[in-house]
Amino acid sequence: MLFRIDFEMGIYPDRVQVADRRSGRFVDFKSEIPFSAQGRLIADPLYFEYALVKAIRKVMSGGFILLDAKVKVLPTAPALRQSERDAVVNALRNIGFKAIRFESDHPSPVAA
């Protein structure tokens, strides 16, 4: 059976947490290559995307389809700068997510 992807994601210094909202599976992944720097949560978007892909692969089990893949990004402390938000959106779109919602925003998702 194939399932649509519906994830929740938290971003921390050099760490990504991903939860599958359907199954309840949760992964807390410490990045092998640091993507944060002093005062910046996402200093290196490429290493952030690499960590995110590895975390997502660990949380997935069973069959998934990327049709209408959704992700909710939890608020961060400190709040993401616009360049960091753009890095998150770009990474998630590169992975295949279509609906990206930042919980700190209005309820409408970022459409593809």
List each model region and its residues:
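Nucleotide/phosphate-binding catalytic cleft detector across ATP-hydrolyzing
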Residues: M1-V16, R21-A112
